[in-house]
């Protein structure tokens, strides 16, 4: 056998050692994350922030794409339940020619006769959908729609696509854990984006609230945990009818969140956003409206240190835009990836 020093063996046939190789997609992704540089970071100079924010707005609109054709909502109340201190109504309404949304409308009993007053669009995260946040299942800590109606707000709680009643009934429970995956596949083939699809559904949900006789159109807030917080942030950033927003268990950065090996749902991302659209960028579009951020000290998905840094940067953005940085509130609590709710009442009672 020829040795490496044998002149009969071409030099290019000898593999240098050691040679680093990687077979792990996750490791490759992690290495890529470390190399990402923001193309258009928030400028340090306050005078440059307004123009930067408009560039963010343009990038976000391009990533979301064009909305589907609007159809009449044609709302229908299919059920009404006396829930003690409030009434829970099941509502169906149309958002696309081939898609409808089921939702609960929670109305405090002392609001049933009017006049129009404030409302909150409560957006669920991963889990059973609207049932849990309305207090019909799951731990009490996650019943934030129930908390909101008991604070006196009319609350609309739609099921997002692939959750709750919008899971496909012909499939087994085992298959349901892949609902977001197949929806991502279907949307990709159709040239659509699941985040944009759910954002459209929420914008149409705002249309429903605006037209409701018990709702003051100038007093609509949005609140959500985890994926619900993702959608709450994007909704407030793209719809000026939202007067205030509560973002729980989310605001930090994509780079920090994706450095943790956990199963990321494809419904929470946009094509080409890495290095071009960070949490701070989206949040900047909410100014000067008030935002309450909740962060658990033990949240394994959205690190609290990154959340603190992002909130500090967001306050600087507010100041640069001539808005009160005090309108960016941060509730850091002892705990993990969950809703806290300790400052919800005071926050929503403030000016917005």
Model-derived segments and spans:
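C-terminal catalytic histidine-bearing segment of alpha/beta-hydrolase fold enzymes
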Residues: 3-4, 312-313, 318-352
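Short beta-strand-to-loop junctions in surface cap/lid or active-site-entrance loops
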Residues: 81-82, 92-96, 103-116, 138
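Mobile cap/lid helix-loop segments that gate and shape the active-site cleft of serine hydrolases
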Residues: 182, 188-189, 204, 242-283, ...
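Alpha/beta-hydrolase fold nucleophile elbow
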Residues: 213-226
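Short beta-strand/loop motif that positions the catalytic acidic residue
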Residues: 286, 293-295
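N-terminal targeting or regulatory segments adjacent to alpha/beta-hydrolase or S9 domains
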Residues: 1-87, 95
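Glycine-rich nucleophile elbow surrounding the catalytic serine of serine-hydrolase chemistry
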Residues: 224-234
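Cap/lid segment of the alpha/beta-hydrolase catalytic domain
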Residues: 112-116, 121-200, 207-211, 256-259
């Amino acid at each position: 056998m020829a040795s490496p020093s044998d002149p009969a063996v071409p030099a290019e046939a000898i593999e240098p050692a050691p040679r680093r190789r990687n077979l792990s997609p996750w490791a490759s992704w992690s290495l890529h994350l470390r190399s990402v540089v923001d193309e258009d970071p928030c400028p340090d100079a306050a005078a440059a922030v307004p123009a930067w924010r408009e560039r963010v707005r343009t990038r976000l609109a391009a990533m979301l794409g064009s909305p589907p054709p609007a159809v009449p909502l044609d709302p229908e109340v299919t059920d009404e339940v006396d829930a003690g201190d409030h009434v829970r109504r099941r509502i169906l309404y149309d958002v696309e020619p081939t898609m409808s949304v089921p939702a609960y409308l929670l109305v405090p009993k002392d609001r049933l006769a009017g006049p129009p007053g404030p409302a909150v669009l409560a957006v669920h995260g991963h889990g059973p959908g609207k049932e849990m946040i309305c207090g019909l299942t799951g731990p009490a800590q996650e019943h934030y729609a129930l908390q909101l109606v008991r604070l006196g707000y009319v609350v609309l709680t739609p099921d997002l696509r692939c959750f709750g009643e919008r899971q496909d009934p012909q499939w087994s429970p085992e298959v349901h854990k892949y609902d977001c995956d197949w929806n991502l596949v279907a949307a990709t083939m159709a040239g659509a984006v699941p985040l944009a699809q759910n954002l459209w559904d929420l914008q149409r949900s705002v249309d429903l609230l605006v037209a409701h006789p018990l709702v003051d159109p100038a007093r609509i807030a949005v609140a959500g945990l985890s994926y619900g917080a993702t959608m709450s942030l994007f909704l407030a950033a793209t719809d000026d009818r939202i007067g205030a927003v509560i973002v729980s268990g989310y605001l930090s950065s994509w780079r920090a969140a994706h450095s943790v090996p956990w199963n990321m749902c494809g419904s929470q991302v946009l094509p080409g956003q890495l290095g071009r659209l960070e949490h701070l960028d989206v949040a900047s579009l909410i100014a000067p409206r008030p935002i309450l951020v909740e962060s658990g000290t033990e949240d394994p998905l959205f690190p609290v240190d990154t959340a603190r840094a992002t909130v500090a940067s967001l306050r600087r953005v507010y100041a640069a835009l001539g808005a009160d940085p005090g309108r960016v509130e941060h509730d850091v609590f002892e705990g993990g990836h969950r809703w806290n709710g300790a400052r919800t009442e005071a926050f929503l009672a403030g000016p917005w």
